[in-house]
Amino acid sequence: MEATKQVVNFGPGPAKLPHSVLLEIQKQLLDYRGLGISVLEMSHRSSDFAKIIGNTENLVRELLAVPNNYKVIFVQGGGSGQFSAVPLNLIGLKAGRSADYVVTGAWSAKAAEEAKKFGTVNIVHPKLGSYTKIPDPSTWNLNPDASYVYFCANETVHGVEFDFVPDVKGAVLVCDMSSNFLSRPVDVSKFGVIFAGAQKNVGSAGVTVVIVRDDLLGFSLRECPSVLDYKVQAGNNSLYNTPPCFSIYVMGMVLEWIKNNGGAAAMEKLSSIKSQMIYEIIDNSQGFYVCPVERQNRSRMNIPFRIGNAKGDEALEKRFLDKAVELNMISLKGHRSVGGIRASLYNAVTTEDVEKLAAFMKNFLEMHQL
């Protein structure tokens, strides 16, 4: 039976899944394609699951035009697991065991902190007072002896997004794309490693996709756990340990949906339309809504803002959130570390969903503006 309550989910991840995908999952849940069992109980060694994981990998390759000299693996541990896996696999590429990190928000800061356990970390720019911009790349102090350069393409907490691929002078470039993966086309050949948790743009929680260039396999530190070792996972076709089968299946279905809806280029177009709708209201509100991020670095995925003034009027913000829930719009509360409001507009969030939020924001503004 279809759920009767229609809620718009602006959650930062886990996030909204396409309705058609949810219905298909529901339909196949008890009996997957006439096999008489659910994917939830299917052996990861079966030929049926081999087709599922093969299909998911092929769709990643097709949608991002992944070159043949890259492996695509599906692992557990989330983005946070990759904060350890990246240095464990790559920091030993050069004798000095050092890495360059660009820190533009909470997630790249966590990644840099984790990497310090395994080698020397160089933050390539002076520490930012607040996470509201991307430091000018011409000022970055890259270490030519670094094993890799790391950045986070989109910071979900602070709403800061790279709209360019940094030029790192031929160094191995590593990117956390968890929150804007497949929201736009990407030239994979510019990267050594790309990783992304599925639970924002491409599926449900539990699986992380890692795209790694072949020549970077086999350099893991001696102390690298086998489950985090890219060479081990790639050599076992992501079946070294029991993978998150159901999450891989859901991801495959979401990728199919993205493909059927025009691919990464169409997602990019939609993301610009959706985010623009909200930023316009913020910018035309005469300071009632305030987004702290510098315009050129604003995220299409996560829009953080305060209400009333730059520091936020907590009573107004509470009223905004309560009223939104009454109107069946959920998960608009900002991250606990920054407060305020945050609207996450991932691939499955429709323009109609965003129009509903935009209309509410206009209405709320009119009711409370002096």
Swiss-Prot record:
The modification Phosphoserine is found at residue 331. Binds 2 pyridoxal phosphate molecules per dimer, each cofactor is bound at the monomer-monomer interface and forms contacts with residues from both chains. One of its GO terms (cellular component) is cytosol. Its EC number is 2.6.1.52. The modification N-acetylmethionine is found at residue 1. Pathway: Amino-acid biosynthesis; L-serine biosynthesis; L-serine from 3-phospho-D-glycerate: step 2/3. Its cofactor is pyridoxal 5'-phosphate. It comes from the Eukaryota. One of its GO terms (molecular function) is O-phospho-L-serine:2-oxoglutarate aminotransferase activity. Keywords: Acetylation, Amino-acid biosynthesis, Aminotransferase, Phosphoprotein, Pyridoxal phosphate, Serine biosynthesis, Transferase. InterPro entries: Aminotrans_V_dom, Aminotrans_V_PyrdxlP_BS, Pser_aminoTfrase, PyrdxlP-dep_Trfase, PyrdxlP-dep_Trfase_major, PyrdxlP-dep_Trfase_small. Pyridoxal 5'-phosphate binds at residues 79, 107, 156, 176, 199, 241-242. It catalyses: O-phospho-L-serine + 2-oxoglutarate = 3-phosphooxypyruvate + L-glutamate. The keyword Transferase applies. SUPFAM superfamilies: PLP-dependent transferases (SSF53383). GO terms for biological process: L-serine biosynthetic process. O-phospho-L-serine binds at residues 44-45, 335-336, 342. The keyword Acetylation applies. The modification N6-(pyridoxal phosphate)lysine is found at residue 200. The modification N6-acetyllysine is found at residues 51, 127, 269, 318, 323, 333. CDD domains: PSAT_like (cd00611). Involved in L-serine biosynthesis via the phosphorylated pathway, a three-step pathway converting the glycolytic intermediate 3-phospho-D-glycerate into L-serine. Catalyzes the second step, that is the pyridoxal 5'-phosphate-dependent transamination of 3-phosphohydroxypyruvate and L-glutamate to O-phosphoserine (OPS) and alpha-ketoglutarate. Homodimer. Belongs to the class-V pyridoxal-phosphate-dependent aminotransferase family. SerC subfamily. This is Phosphoserine aminotransferase. It comes from Mus musculus.
